[in-house]
Each structure stands twice: as C-alpha cells, then as structure tokens.
Amino acid sequence: MAKVSMKNREQKREKLVAKYAAKRAELKAIIKNPNTSDDDRWDAQMKLQQLPRDSSPSRLRNRCQVTGRPHGVLRKFELSRIKLREYGMRGDVPGLTKASW
C-alpha cells in the first residue's frame, strides 16, 4: 500500500494538469508556430516556465486504484498486476480467465 500522502500528491497533480492544460497547449502552440516572432516565442517560453511544475502531464504517474502501487499497473484496468490477479481469481473481473492451452 502506498502512503496516503503519495496518493493525495498524485491527485493534486491531476487537478493541476487539468487546470492548466488549455493554457499550456496555447503557449506550446505559440512556441511551435513558425510564423511567430522571436520576441513572442521568447515571451511564451518564459510564461510556460512560470507555470507550476506539477501542472506538466509528464509528472503524472499511473497508480493502482486500490493500493496506490506505482509499478506494474495495467492501464486497461487501472490495477496493479497483483490486485488484477487477485480479482481475476475471485471472478471479479468479467471476461478474465486463467490461461490454459
């Protein structure tokens, strides 16, 4: 189990990413536009750097919804490999069966 503070920190990051997504996309569009003047591009880069660090989507981490485990998380189920196996064996995940060939 991950510490509660780590789970809360991740939720805080998700909120910040959602809050600043439009602003970040707008600034990146200005920077990538080849018709933008150098001064405008420089201003956009400075504004982008002034945004909160945790508002960057690359700082997000996929975590297990049950335990908060950061490694071995399957995106489709949002569960760690351990919990997915446990739930699969109990029959809680529809369509998931143990392999046999």
UniProtKB/Swiss-Prot annotation:
One of its GO terms (biological process) is translation. Part of the 30S ribosomal subunit. Contacts proteins S3 and S10. PANTHER family: 30S RIBOSOMAL PROTEIN S14, SMALL RIBOSOMAL SUBUNIT PROTEIN US14M. Belongs to the universal ribosomal protein uS14 family. HAMAP family: Ribosomal_uS14_1 (MF_00537). Keywords: Ribonucleoprotein, Ribosomal protein, RNA-binding, rRNA-binding. Pfam families: Ribosomal_S14 (PF00253). It comes from the Bacteria. One of its GO terms (cellular component) is cytoplasm. This is Small ribosomal subunit protein uS14. Binds 16S rRNA, required for the assembly of 30S particles and may also be responsible for determining the conformation of the 16S rRNA at the A site. InterPro entries: Ribosomal_uS14, Ribosomal_uS14_bac/plastid, Ribosomal_uS14_CS. GO terms for molecular function: rRNA binding; structural constituent of ribosome.
